[in-house]
Amino acid sequence: GVDDYSGGYQIGNYLYSCGYDKAIFIAETDIDSDYSRWVGFKQAMEQDGKFCSRTRLVIVSYEKKKRLQKYSELLPRFLEVKALAFSSDYDAIEAMNFFLDQGIKIPDQISITGYDDSIYAQMVRPKLTTVHQDVSQKAHLALSRLLRMAAGEQLKEMNVKSPVHLVRRESVKEKNRPLI
């Protein structure tokens, strides 16, 4: 699989470094890859002795109508914290469209990040800041391991992590970020 914890940490660290120390993480579940991404995000948000409570993990429905209803209910809170990290590009882009329909400017009023670096992350406006995972490398690793196991080889490590990296685009307002 991919290193979901690292991806979550990279997003959290980036938002924290931009001054969004109260950012919220949004996912459809609190298990598996979503949970690993949340734990990484949470860890990054706890720099400088700060605490990131479970209330900053928002679980949204699989159903679009219910998700949009949740975004509407939480809109004042979202605008207060000014940054949202989504566990998928799909949900991030859907939320961006919802916010734009409400007249909210991205990233000026709210910064948004996704996860996956899907093809749509570059097509949406503003272009989505996200975590890139190399799907072809992931498939290659899986196939290679499968062939080795089929040949009778005993593999020592069953869970190999494919590296991920942050892709900075236009959906985050980089306030308080030092120039490098």
Positions of predicted regions on the chain:
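Flexible loop/turn connectors
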Residues: 68-180
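Hinge/beta->alpha junction and helix N-cap segments in small-molecule ligand-binding domains
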Residues: 1-10, 26-70, 85-93, 115-118, ...
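Short, well-ordered alpha-helices that flank and scaffold nucleotide-derived cofactor binding pockets
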Residues: 13, 17, 39, 43-47, ...
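Short acidic capping loops at alpha-helix termini that bridge into adjacent secondary structure
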Residues: 22, 52-56, 105-112
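Alpha-helical recognition/docking segments in bacterial nutrient-uptake
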Residues: 1-13, 17, 73-80
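Short acidic/polar active-site loop segments enriched in Thr and Asp
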Residues: 20-22, 82
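ATP/adenylate-binding site constellation spanning eukaryotic-like Ser/Thr protein kinases
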Residues: 20, 38, 125
